[in-house]
Amino acid sequence: EKDFALVEDALVKEDMFEKRNRLYSSLSGGEKQRVLLARALAQEPTLLLLDEPTNHLDIKYQLDLLSIVKNLQINVLAVLHDIQLACRYSNYLYLMKEGEIVYQGTPKETITPESLQAVYGVQSQVTWTEDQQAMIHYL
């Protein structure tokens, strides 16, 4: 009974409860992504590992999913290629190049024109909003 309640709660969080009776193969890529997250959440993990969890998701669902994950009260290690989303939803970042961590720290400490040049080979200007969101302008 508890397991059913956990699954139901996870599906509701991911806005997938109404599609619970559909075959997995009939879901869109984004819906499949949300079901997989719901499945992981139903296991009540203490550590959640996510590899590109926002792939195939519309912007609204990217924001919804990352907001849910941030509010879980568990440790999350997520691989994200969208720097601005990573800054918005992370307390701590690792920037990697060729499999090595080359920068780490808070988003504001980590995301700088120098780090973006070193890791991605791009020139940029980075400014921060009052609510600590990165605004990156690539030159």
Task: Outline where the language-model segments fall.
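Conserved ABC ATPase signature
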Residues: 23-27, 31
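Hydrophobic anchor residue at the start of the ABC signature
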Residues: 37-38, 65
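Conserved ABC ATPase "signature" region
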Residues: 2-19
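ABC ATPase nucleotide-binding domains
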Residues: 113-139
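A short, proline-enriched helix->beta-strand linker immediately N-terminal to the Walker B motif
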Residues: 42-46
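Catalytic Walker B motif of ABC-type/P-loop ATPase nucleotide-binding domains
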Residues: 48-52
